Amino acid sequence: MSGKANASKKNFEQLKRNPKRKKDNEEVVLSEKKVRNTVKRNKNHLKDLFSEGQTKHTNLKQIKIAPNKRKTWQPLSKSTRDYLQTMMESVLRTILSDRIKDKEEIQYHLNFLKNRLLQLCETLKVPPKKMEDLTNVSRLLNMERARGKANEEGLALLQEEIDKMVETTELMTGNIQSLKNKIQILASEVEEEEERVKQIHQINTSGVLSLPELSQKTLKAPTLQKEILALIPNQNALLKDLDILHNSSHMKSMSTFIEEAYKKLNAS
């Protein structure tokens, strides 16, 4: 008893002389306590999970199988167990890749469940039909992957066709808008031309030309014929000669010729 007291006293004096070592020992003790608490908490959590699983298991419907049928059951093959292990590890990596709290504890629980399941699979026996199904899991998975890849390629081709159709539709929409703009410009030009024609001809609602009114001075002014006749001394003789000339056969022939010429010009 005195030896233990001397040893503890010696350790106390060493820690007193070396405070850094004392601090390191305290950190080691704290880390050990933390590890013990974590392990204890994990064990309690696993017990809770196990009890919860048993509670759920009691609610499941149990199926009785004849002993003679169990004789044909076979243990899982190593390839099937390796495949299950690979699949579970892939799921674990996917879960742990996310940013989640208490990742170490979750990883510990998941690894524990994985190892427990793999241990059960080593001694597990299944019917031959189930064995074939588990053996064909890899083949079925490859078939589903190939089908998914084919679907993705089909969707990619469909997306390319949709993009082309959208591009063609946008081009046609642009052409239609351009034609609408041209039609609008032409319509405005036609309206301007119609207004210009109306202004030139000055057509009123009755269809009669709206000519400017003549002044009273213009109406009262002598005609050009009267002015010319006023310059001729012998007006009656001149009018008589013009009447004879107008009624002569040569003048009539000339008038007929001119009329025929106008008719031919109009016909052509």
Curated annotation (Swiss-Prot):
Residues where Phosphoserine is found: S31, S249
Signal peptide annotation: none
Main localisation: nucleus
GO cellular component terms given for this protein: chromosome, centromeric region; nucleus
Coiled coil location: 170-203
Region (Disordered): 1-31
Keyword terms, alphabetized: Centromere, Chromosome, Coiled coil, Nucleus, Phosphoprotein
One example of a Gene Ontology biological process annotation: metaphase chromosome alignment
Subcellular location: Nucleus; Chromosome, Centromere
InterPro entries linked to this entry: CAD_CENP-Q (IPR025212)
Pfam families referenced in this protein's UniProt entry, alphabetically: CENP-Q (PF13094)
Keyword Nucleus: yes
Subunit architecture: Component of the CENPA-CAD complex, composed of CENPI, CENPK, CENPL, CENPO, CENPP, CENPQ, CENPR and CENPS. The CENPA-CAD complex interacts with the CENPA-NAC complex, at least composed of CENPA, CENPC, CENPH, CENPM, CENPN, CENPT and CENPU.
Listed PANTHER family: CENTROMERE PROTEIN Q
Family, similarity comment: Belongs to the CENP-Q/OKP1 family.
Functional description taken from the UniProt entry: Component of the CENPA-CAD (nucleosome distal) complex, a complex recruited to centromeres which is involved in assembly of kinetochore proteins, mitotic progression and chromosome segregation. May be involved in incorporation of newly synthesized CENPA into centromeres via its interaction with the CENPA-NAC complex. Plays an important role in chromosome congression and in the recruitment of CENP-O complex (which comprises CENPO, CENPP, CENPQ and CENPU), CENPE and PLK1 to the kinetochores.
Name of the protein: Centromere protein Q
Species this protein is from: Macaca fascicularis (Crab-eating macaque)
